[in-house]
Amino acid sequence: MTIKLVGIGGMGLMLSPSAKHLKPGGHARFLRIHDRGTKDDRRDMCRQAWKDHGADIVHDYETLVGDGDYDGVVICAGKNGDDCDIFRALVPLMQRNKKSQPFILHLSTVSAGFAQAAYDFLSAEGIDYVNYPLTGGPLGAENANMLILASGSESIYSKLEPTLQTIGNPKYFGSSVTAGAEVKLMGQLMVFNGLVGICSAAALKSECFQEELSGSEQAEFFDFLNGGAGGTRQWDVAISKGVRDNTWDQGFMTQHAVVDAIYAAKLCRERGLPALAVIPMVAIALAFAYLLKKYEGTPLATHAIVREMIQKNASGLDDFTTQHINYTDVDASIKNSIAALPQRVKDSVMLDINKDSFSA
């Protein structure tokens, strides 16, 4: 039997490719997709793809949930603060015409605390909840090989697995509702530490050899050196865009990455890891916060930090980070990294969350 879904975030880079991957008569189909109405060529293509899939495009949550003719709601949206707002608006509407026990499949990257609080809140509302974060970027979503980090109810995973295998590469990490979020943040530790390593090397190469950061010689150098023991995928998927093509506004965008770094720092702290694990995440979060402040209104991806790491710019980055990092007080450093963010990004972090946060 085909699973009937409605979706929030269907115009985004990670969920929109599902419109073409899920075929008629398959394991699942989307009945309706919520559209915030942002106009550009990419989203227009997404709208057409969803229409070709057979989904109706709707502009409010009330129409999205309709008369309760769906099995589950798929949400692939923002961070804790963004998605908490969605849940507050959505759940009362789901309750109004609830025909059975629906589920929410939450694909966003949120903190482990969010996943637990959402589960506790929705369980009391008679709604099943699972958080399956995605990793692999827009290309992974487009090619249906992104990793889907699943956990929580085994019966829900078994029901969804054929659908998940159609849009990506799922792996189930057990019955803990927070395991998917935790695994995603483990991956982000690898991403951000790899990013700092390759950016440090690129900045040092520029200074030692007295060369520009970008250019064909730099690209050839790191194509070679990245084949050694220090190789990282952050060369291929991130900084090579800047070094090879002088492109700094495409990739993992800083306003999203900074929140993930804070979530990773918080999780490491909660699980008792040493400052050696936590402080680098705070430092990279502050580096991203510095970019957001220095280049306010200019879209920049994470690898743009390398431009602040060369000698002529390094003092500005140092001055900013040393204001906020306290190596002897990890908790204060995490709080300071949040306080340093622009307000709109700060609101999305929402580290302090419990089940009462979702009450409208």
Regions found by a protein language model. Give the residues of each.
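NAD(P)+-binding Rossmann beta1-loop-alpha1 motif at the extreme N-terminus of oxidoreductases
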Residues: 1-74, 138, 171-172, 203, ...
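Rossmann-fold dinucleotide-binding core
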Residues: 8-9, 109-192
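Rossmann-like NAD(P)-binding element
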Residues: 13, 55-113, 142, 146-149
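Anion (oxyanion) recognition and catalysis
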Residues: 23, 51, 123, 164-165, ...
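Hydrophobic beta-strand scaffold residues
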Residues: 57, 128-130, 275
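Helical "substrate-binding/catalytic lid" subdomain
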Residues: 178-309
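NAD(P)-dependent dehydrogenase/reductase Rossmann-like domain
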Residues: 268, 285-360
